[in-house]
Swiss-Prot record:
Belongs to the PsbX family. Type 1 subfamily. The lineage of its organism: Bacteria, Bacillati, Cyanobacteriota, Cyanophyceae, Nostocales. InterPro entries: PSII_PsbX, PSII_PsbX_type_1_subfam. Involved in the binding and/or turnover of quinones at the Q(B) site of photosystem II (PSII). PSII is a light-driven water plastoquinone oxidoreductase, using light energy to abstract electrons from H(2)O, generating a proton gradient subsequently used for ATP formation. The gene is psbX. This is Photosystem II reaction center protein X.
Amino acid sequence: MTPSLSNFLWSLAWGTLIVVIPATVGLIFISQKDKIQRS
């Protein structure tokens, strides 16, 4: 694997982590909050 390809894959992986993790945490937080409001 060439260094540029390796860097590209790493940047994709980090980009995914940076987007997916906060989105997941946000969804969990919102769903928990929503549950509390309904009950």
